């Protein structure tokens, strides 16, 4: 869980910016986007196979 403690003289905008940075760093956006729709086991296999191929081509 990402939390931001706001300082006494801190502006809300800067606290919000800090919160957004922490959420992005934790990978929460990517996780939400990934789990937005149900993915069948076949789709998972295909996605992982494509990722493997992409990794192999990057190594060369």
From Swiss-Prot:
Record carries keyword Ribonucleoprotein: yes
Instruction: For this entry, list what GO says about its biological process.
Output: translation
Q: Could you tell me where the Basic residues compositional bias lies?
A: 45-60
Q: What InterPro entries does this protein's entry cite?
A: Ribosomal_bS21 (IPR001911), Ribosomal_bS21_CS (IPR018278), Ribosomal_bS21_sf (IPR038380)
Q: Which domain of life is it from?
A: Bacteria
GO cellular component terms attached to this protein's record: ribonucleoprotein complex; ribosome
What keywords tag this UniProt record?
Ribonucleoprotein, Ribosomal protein
Region annotated Disordered sits at 41-60
Q: Which Gene3D superfamilies match?
A: Ribosomal protein S8
Record's keyword annotation contains Ribosomal protein = yes
- Gene Ontology molecular function: any one: structural constituent of ribosome
**Record-linked NCBIfam families:** S21p
Give the UniProt family note: Belongs to the bacterial ribosomal protein bS21 family.
Query: Which protein, by its recorded name, is this?
Result: Small ribosomal subunit protein bS21
